[in-house]
Curated annotation (Swiss-Prot):
Name of this chain's protein: Probable dipeptidyl-aminopeptidase B
Function: Type IV dipeptidyl-peptidase which removes N-terminal dipeptides sequentially from polypeptides having unsubstituted N-termini provided that the penultimate residue is proline.
InterPro entries associated with the record: AB_hydrolase_fold, Peptidase_S9_cat, Peptidase_S9B_N, Serine_Prot_S9B/DPPIV
Record topological domains on the Cytoplasmic side: 1-95
Amino acid composition bias (Polar residues), ranges on this chain: 44-55
Gene3D superfamilies for this protein: alpha/beta hydrolase, Dipeptidylpeptidase IV, N-terminal domain
Reactions accelerated catalytically: Release of an N-terminal dipeptide, Xaa-Yaa-|-Zaa-, from a polypeptide, preferentially when Yaa is Pro, provided Zaa is neither Pro nor hydroxyproline
Ranges of the Vacuolar topological domain: 117-919
A single Gene Ontology CC term: fungal-type vacuole membrane
Topology term for the membrane: Single-pass type II membrane protein
EC number per UniProt: 3.4.14.5
Transmembrane segments: 96-116
Name of the encoding gene: DAPB
Length: 919
């Protein structure tokens, strides 16, 4: 569930909470762990993309072999050695057997017909009453109805992922705007270089072109070094390069670091005394003269004028982290691997001290795999490898965090105490924003995320004060949504800004809007946006020369995204992209906001172009990606049509999208698969172009697929979102059930064949919906990596929406999947989970299975993927999990699970054996 990340239609996403929604899946181009959106090979960035860019490599795991599926009954006959016709021995006996078989088959067929005709579970009649929904838009594919069906392997393999170019914007040494960091592939041109955005193809000479690394390899003491990640210094004279990367958690990694001199094209270890020491994090000073880094959980500093490395801390260890987050802060708070911040003048370093001594450990067992370099002790080869994770579950002790400071010139560490009434065990440091003059803006929340406090700390004076305090519980009963987009605005009297300030997203009249606080100590802001719509991860960019703020918002529709600009005084709000069409845009701005990478992401074929901002007098407009191959595919294959509408439940308008199969015929009866995620603040119904598992189900299997974003999801206002506070699962499930009831009234829907499925939070919602519905509307469900008890999930995420279990015992009981009697009313359901899931622990599924065992239930199937984490990838498991979903769903809608509800032994085999024996 991690913190804020752009998420859309997400299957294997981790639980995520707010902002733009959930994390990536096989179709999402957002921020996540398991995206199959393709990044063009020629555009892989040499540095980590900035917060306003999205780009994720395909997570395919090689090729897959089509497996043969055998009918078990057919195989058993072969084992009996029965020959259906002919054969020399015992022809008379064979004829007797033949006629007995005929009689038995006819009788069996007749009996089966009577049973099926009288069974309510097999009546496929539906009500002809109309739905309560209102249809608003249909997105039809370009493909002919007789086009090819989309194979599942093509979807999982990334064939349908749009090519997305990620751009690493970089400022020039003199503040030049519109520069890109580029890495050449295939040995063509210099390996690492800076180009002007107007010369992105390198076709003409440009004064802003700078070669940083001529070759893709360099040598240190005869050792051949091939950099995997690079970070140029702000003055572009040195490159920090990393090799031998080892992945840690979702965002964190370690590696060996090197300093590469641009002028001499030579390199040296970051720490000459420990060249093989694995570094967890490293970052440049704004003045380019030093690098601060964390190794073995301690912080060090290396000044470029010396080869000496100086320790800033020395007591870091297994339970004490400096400058990097622990697991829960990485996953749920920062969404990244850094907890170190330089002051803008480079004179001070602030860093987080994280103490997780009191945090309980959770074991993750690996039965088949081992960490790189790990060798079991002799005699222990047959035992699982157990990884212990400090994982604070809901109500358990959290890590305690404190913000520390280091004076670079004086070489001394210190802390600044600010009394804001948050105790150490009730504090989450959510965001740190460097400001001018050695100042830092610090956003803190209480543990249950309903109190937010903003503090200004002056490192030079070693003092600080609280400048803002809000109690969201008193505003709307909701929660504070984590932010990573707060933007500092320096003072500039010549530009009309006499004081410094910052832009933040706040709650205004029930919606998330942009506010400008100036001076920074002012608790009352100037509103930059207002209305019944919301800003998204805003601001995207700020033009300080012209006092213009750029942002993405849902002003036209909750399921649309458009790019807007507004003046710092709140005037001249305008849309920058095509205002006449419903669409989904994203944007990435250059550091000075003079240029932008505009990304059209749907509903039609995505494209990208580089353009100058409206405030930039130097006009520029160039398309860099049209996804022609994707357009070609969409003309060859039959894609479903998308029908967008809203349905009103309890006075709330819920966005819905229905995928109809090619050659849809309203006179036929179609089974329906509901797909959902449903996590707080997430969004699954939107106008992005996606070809995913849902597309495959509609296109290849010919089923209807419906997705509804119920209450609790994002971008429909705080009232819509925060109603789920303290009671996760209830309203969300209610909305799925009511929507399914309305869909069951449609003349083309077979209401006796309705299923629901989801992954992660969607897995929880699948089970909660089945539990609440008790077989009345949904007959089938498929839950992947589900939460079944919120006491098992991490504290930061869970308590944000549920409070601590100690303060909401009844809510936790209600939110757990515990009513086995209700689940027994469904025809059948499927649960799948990875045994090494470090996010939603396998404990969730095992606990539910125990409850089902106690009740003697048997209307479910379980598939466990050994050593797979939350994404379920190990040993081609990602292919398997989707193939199992597909096969299981086909069997469900073919009535196979109805047949298995009351299995009876077949006497046919015994009769034949006896006849063969005595004949």
């Amino acid at each position: 569930m991690g913190a804020n990340s752009r998420v859309n239609d997400d299957e294997a996403m981790p639980l995520t909470g707010h902002g733009a929604g959930s994390r990536d899946s096989i179709d999402s181009s957002s921020t996540a762990s398991i995206s199959l959106t393709l990044v063009d090979g020629a555009s892989h960035t040499a540095t980590e993309p900035s917060k306003s860019t999205n780009g994720h490599k395909s997570h395919t795991e090689g090729s897959y072999v089509n497996e043969k599926y055998h009918d078990s009954e057919e195989e058993s006959w072969r084992e009996d050695g029965y020959v259906p016709s002919g054969g020399k021995p015992a022809q008379r006996r064979t004829r007797i057997v033949f006629w007995l078989l005929v009689a038995l088959c006819v009788g069996g067929w007749a009996m089966a017909f009577i049973i099926m005709a009288t069974s309510p579970n097999n009546r496929h009649s539906t009500s002809d009453s109309s739905s309560g929904g209102s249809e608003s838009e249909i997105v039809k594919p370009n493909t002919p109805h007789d086009g090819k069906k989309i194979p599942l392997d093509d979807v999982l393999g990334g064939m349908w992922g749009p090519v997305e170019h990620t751009i690493s914007w970089i400022s020039g040494p003199k503040g030049e705007d519109g520069l890109l960091l580029q890495k050449s592939e295939g040995g063509i041109g210099p390996y690492l270089h800076i180009e002007d955005v107007r010369n992105i193809h390198g076709m003409r000479a440009n004064n802003n072109s700078i070669v940083l690394m001529k070759e893709s390899v360099f040598f240190v003491n005869d050792e051949r070094i091939s950099p995997e990640k690079v970070w140029p210094s702000p003055d572009l004279k040195t490159v920090l390069a990393m090799t031998r990367e080892k992945k840690n958690w979702r965002h964190s990694f370690t590696g060996l670091y090197w300093l590469f001199d641009v002028e001499t094209q030579t390199a040296q270890p970051l720490d000459p005394e420990a060249p093989n020491g694995r570094v967890q994090l490293a970052s440049w000073s704004p003045t380019s003269d030093a690098v601060v880094f964390t190794r073995d959980n301690n912080i060090y500093i290396r000044n470029l004028t010396s080869k000496a490395v100086k320790p800033i801390t020395t007591d870091g260890g297994a339970n004490l982290f400096y400058g990097i987050p622990d697991w829960v802060y990485e996953e749920e708070v920062f969404e990244g691997n850094s907890a170190t911040w330089w002051s803008l003048d480079g004179k001070y370093i602030s860093f987080l001290r994280t103490n997780e001594t009191m945090v309980p450990e959770f074991p993750i067992d690996f039965y088949l795999s081992r960490p790189p370099g790990y060798t079991p002790e002799p005699g222990e080869e047959a035992y699982p490898y157990v990884q212990q994770i400090k994982y604070p579950k809901a109500g358990a002790p959290n890590p305690t965090v404190n913000l520390q400071f280091y004076d670079v010139e004086r070489e001394e560490s210190f802390s600044v105490n600010v009394d804001n009434n948050l105790k150490d065990d009730d504090r989450i440091i959510a965001e740190v924003i460097p400001a001018s003059g050695g100042k830092m803006l610090v956003r803190e929340t209480n543990r249950e995320s309903y109190i937010v406090k903003v503090t200004v700390i002056d490192a030079a004076k070693r003092e600080g004060k609280m400048v803002r305090s809000d109690n969201v519980d008193e505003i709307d009963g909701g929660w504070v949504e984590p932010s990573h987009s707060t933007t500092y605005i320096p003072s500039d009297p010549s530009a009309g800004r006499p004081h410094d300030g910052y832009i933040d997203t706040i709650i205004h009249e029930g919606y998330n809007h942009l506010a400008y606080f100036t001076p920074v100590e002012n608790p009352k802001p100037m509103m930059l946006t207002t209305g019944n719509w919301e800003v998204v991860d805003a601001p995207s960019g700020v033009d300080l020369k012209n006092n213009v703020v750029y942002f993405v918002a849902t002003k036209e529709s909750p399921i649309d995204r458009h790019v807007y600009s507004v003046k710092l005084d709140g005037s001249e709000l305008q849309m920058l992209n095509d205002s006449e069409k419903s669409a989904y845009y994203d944007v990435s701005f250059s550091n000075g906001a003079g240029y932008m990478l505009l990304k059209y992401q749907g509903p039609n074929i995505p494209w990208q172009k580089l353009i100058s901002s409206p405030s930039n007098e130097d006009f520029y407009d160039e398309i860099i990606e049209e996804n022609k191959n994707l357009a070609r595919l969409s003309n060859e294959f039959s894609l479903p049509s998308l029908h967008y509408s809203t349905i009103t439940v309890d006075g709330f308008k819920l966005p819905v999208v229905e995928r109809r199969p090619p050659n849809f015929n309203e006179t036929k009866k179609y089974p329906v698969l509901f797909h959902l995620y449903g996590g707080p603040g997430s969004q699954t119904v939107n106008k992005k172009f996606t070809v995913n598992f849902q597309t495959y189900v509609a296109s290849n299997l010919g089923y209807l697929v419906v997705t509804v974003d119920g209450r609790g999801t994002g971008f429909n206002g705080r009232k819509f979102r925060c109603i789920v506070r303290r009671n996760l699962g209830y309203y969300e499930a209610h909305d799925q059930i009511q929507t399914a009831k309305e869909w069951g009234k449609k003349p083309y829907v077979d209401k006796t064949r309705i299923a629901i499925w989801g992954w992660s939070y969607g897995g929880f919602m699948t089970l909660k919906t089945l539990e609440q519905d008790a077989g009345e509307t949904f007959q089938y469900g498929m839950a992947v990596a589900p939460v079944t008890d919120w006491r098992f999930y991490d504290s930061v995420y869970t308590e944000r929406y549920m409070h601590m279990p100690q303060h909401n015992t009844e809510g936790y009981e209600n939110a757990s999947i515990s009513n086995a009697t209700s689940l027994s009313q469904n025809t059948r359901f499927l649960i799948m989970h990875g045994s090494a899931d470090d996010n939603v622990h396998f404990q969730n599924t095992l606990t539910l299975l125990d409850k089902l065992d106690i009740m003697g239930m048997h209307n479910y199937d379980v598939h466990v993927f050994p050593d797979s984490n939350h994404g379920i990838y190990f040993h081609h498991a990602y292919k398997m999990v989707h193939q199992r979903l597909s096969d299981w769903l086909v069997n469900a809608f073919n009535g196979e699970w109805v047949r298995l509800r009351n299995p009876k032994p077949s006497g046919l085999k015994r009769v034949i054996r006896r006849l063969l024996h005595f004949g």
